Amino acid sequence: MDLYSRKIIAWTLSKTLEVDEVLKCLETAKSRRKTANPVVIQSDRGIHYTSRRYRELTRDMVCSYSRKGNPWDNACIESYHALIKREWLNRFKIMNYHQAYQLVFEYLEGFYNTVRIHSHCEYLSPNEYENKYMLEETN
C-alpha cells in the first residue's frame, strides 16, 4: 500500500505463507513504482520480512518494522484488511482458492483502487488522488 494515496500497488493471494510469495509481490511493487526518491517499506516482524532473502531484495529501501505486538504501527494495511472483509468478502461463502482470488481481484482492481473514496485522499479514490498529484506536479 502506498501510504500517500492508499493505493494497493501489488498483492498476492497464497495458499501458503511462503517467503517466495512475499518476494514476488515486492518485485511487482518495485517494478510498478520506479522512483528516485527513497522508498520506506513498513512491515511487521514476521519471518518473511526478516528473512535474508527479503533483506537482500530491500537493501535499497528503508525497512521500517512495527514494534512487537503493536499492530497500530501497520494501521493502514490492518484497516484495509478489515475493509475488504467487511465490505466484500463476508458477503460470500468462499468455496475454493479460485473464487477467493476472483473476489479479492474484483474488490481491489474494480473497486478499492478505482472507486472507493478515502478521507485521507480528499474523498477521492486512490487512483484519482494519484492522478491529481501527478497533474499538480507537472504544472
Predicted segment positions?
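Gly/Pro-enriched, hydrophobic low-complexity segments
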Residues: M1-L3
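C-terminal domain-tail junction helix/linker
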Residues: M61, L83-N139
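RNase H-like two-metal-ion nuclease catalytic core shared by retroviral integrases
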Residues: S43-R45, S51-R52, S66-K85, N96, ...
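Hydrophobic "anchor" residues
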Residues: S5-I8, T114
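Hydrophobic "anchor" residues on beta-strands that sit immediately upstream
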Residues: V40
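Two-metal-ion acidic nuclease core segments, chiefly of the RNase H-like superfamily
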Residues: R55-V62
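Active-site beta-loop-alpha junctions of metal-dependent nucleic acid enzymes
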Residues: W11-T35
